[in-house]
Every structure is written in structure tokens, then in C-alpha cells.
Amino acid sequence: MKKIILFAFTALLLTSCGSKSDVVSGTKKSSWNNFNHPQVNFVNKAGGTTGWEIYNRIIPNPDVYIKKNILEVVQTLYWSSADSIPNIQKINYTIEDVDGISAKGGGVPEISIFYSSRWVEKSEQGGGDDKVLFETRGVLLHELTHGYQLEPQGIGNYGSNKTFWAFIEGMADAVRAHNGGFPATNRKPGGNWMDGYQTTGFFLQWLTTKDADFLRKFNKSTLEVVPWSFDGAIKHVLGKKYSIDGLWNEYQAFLTSNKKS
């Protein structure tokens, strides 16, 4: 993608941050003028690599780029800046010459995210600059969600409970999917809502067809449904007539029907 488009992204962010315009969610108008962006400490640890050269060419102002995506994440998870948003004050973002893709570490008030220059180079080889920008944004949305999402209560933690893990990874990919961060062809029938990542994420994103604010309400359910469970949260958000099994079966039927058509 041409640099001019990236500069347009930068201009759009600066304009939106300085304007009085509101974000409309369903029938509720939400102002984000008071949202406090964290400090972004961007460090290049992959100097001299092809991946870094590609990243630096495509994203000339990473601070602005990262903050733009932060706003997209919090607007997907919350109604306004007055909500109970984790108070992330600093993000250490590094480009590193390592295998893998990306990962988030730490917690409030300071988190760290690394992104692999090797993955950038691989993406470039698979689809040019457009693929790099698409993949970089999608991966960033996922990792930023880990910083800003709420966590299930009363069921252990990420390493000890599969439901907790499935929620965390599923919501991160749901936010990514909701903001156009995956190819549409990635959504396929099969699996289980407990599989996490894209399998869970696409399912949760599909549930916005039941309620446009589903992802916000599902995120907030972690504070209201204790001990937390998928079925308990579904009933809390959509009503007692719904169940996780029933909605999953409906979702699978929808995917299968679309695949045949």
C-alpha cells in the first residue's frame, strides 16, 4: 500500500482526536474525547533486517498508528471513556528479529508487545505491502485487546482454566474480526466455542447479529457473572431463552448454509 494512504491514516487520527465528534453505538451516543491514550515507547530491535525496513516504510509513524488502533479496540469493548477500562499508562512496543508473530506481556499500568520482523518479511513475500499492513493491523488489534479486555472472575486464571483462556483468546480475535482484521475466508464451520482464537472469535462476532452491543456486554459480563461461564454470560447478555449450545448450533448451521450457497 502506498505511503500516501498511511499518511492519510495519520491525518485521520489527528483530526479525530482533536474534534468534538462522537462515536455512535446502536442508539447510544458515546464521547471518547476524554480517553487518555497511554504513552507508547516504540523500540526497534531488528535494525538491519528486511522486515524492519518494510515495517518502517509502511508505518512511518508507529506512535500515531498504535494509538489509532488502541481507540478502535476500546470503542469495540466499551461504550465510552467513562467505563471501567483498564488504566494502561504505558505500552512498550518492540520490533524484534525473532520467530513467532507477536505477544503481549505485563499488565496494568504497563504492558509490552513484541512484533516479529520475520513475520513482516514473510507477509510481504505472501502479498506485498497490502498484506503486511493488513496483517500488522490485525495482529496489533489482537494484542491490544489483551491489554484492554476485562477478565472472567471466580474461575482461576489464563494458565489454570480453559474457559478463562478461551474467553481471553476468543475475545481478542472477536475484536480483530469485528474490525475487519481477518480475511472473510477464515471463517469456517467446525470446532467448538471453547477452541479459542478465531473459532471462538468469529462466533462471538457473529453474536453481534443478535445484539449490536454484544461484544461490549459480553466483555462487561465478566464483572457481573461470577463465577463466569460462557452459558451464564450468554443468558445474562441475551436472555435466559438462549444457551451457548443452541447458539453454537445455529451459528454452525449458518456457516454451513452459506458455504453451500
Question: What are these model-derived regions, one by one?
Answer:
Residues 159-200:
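Post-HExxH zinc-binding segment in Zn-dependent metallohydrolases
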Residues 22-23, 56-114:
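Auxiliary, metal-adjacent structural segments of Zn-dependent hydrolase domains
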Residues 138-151, 169-173:
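Active-site recognition of the HExxH zinc-binding catalytic motif
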